[in-house]
């Protein structure tokens, strides 16, 4: 593994790079090597106050005076420059997150760029209405920016989820304060640099780094912030709801999941096997919509699980910077320990380990690598069937018929995504309508489009 120089590692406030007011920093660690690759500021209240003031001034000043079409052009240029710098940005994403460079370079950076370019087209298509009312009066509505928006971003898709929040906010005329996860701040800082290069006015995009427990909390409670857009775990989302209540901020929450991948015996089983493995092992399973529960008809369960396990055993983790690697490093030591704890709990509760189950060594003796892990014989009350692990750990559960498949799929506090595998299109749509999930895929998994909504039921936000 070769090193990449990290050029931007300060706060970005009002178009300027600066250290935190208190001078404190936090380490950014490459999870594949366990080496510190950067130190970034740990912001304090004074830094957040400065970012809010800059965002408010830009909203009331140069950004607010731009026409919608001019604003859209700038948002488009951000996407354009992301693509132009895709190699550099993808490398940063892999270095601080541990995901394979193939995913960063060929999937996630292009998807982030597409997000900016998609929403750029919306900037001049947001209209008010003229309302017919009685009497000799003219009544009309305007759609106005919410104001200063804080985007609190998790560590699993640092760039892409930043784009999901920032692009629509900018297109609608808001200004933004980005709070990346403390483990993965580098691509948010790179994005701020790109925005400045294309001419986005100072104060429109600000980046504040530091721990969520302190910096994130101060952002949530700040009276000068009008809206919070958060992606992360459900418990943190609940805390944000409580913290935002005192100032009655608008919030959007995209939270956890325990998504079922449902395989019926009449499915294309080879395709379903591929879908079951990519559904859980893409992104190392650190995906809110990961297909972490595999529900299989009992008539095919044994052979099907054997084939999924055989495929998983061939997916050895590797150097994330190797273009051939398809399974990278777990994002942090803390997350690896969390994954291993769940694996031990599954064993203790009687689940049958059929693949993986331990740390992996890619030959360096370093790095937070985990074997792709599959448990068979999982029952709905087991911990790994109910709690979000957020790692490459699959729980296989059998069902007897369509009704039991639906009941078991819905037997969760989450409802972000699901998939149905069958050649019977009538059955597919019947099941999809009864599933309590924001996104339901049929005979595929992990297909996203910027034009499609992405939300959930229950505690998925």
What are these regions (language model features)?
Residues 1-40, 73, 77, 125-152, ...:
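Terminal low-complexity tails and localization/encapsulation signals of metabolic enzymes
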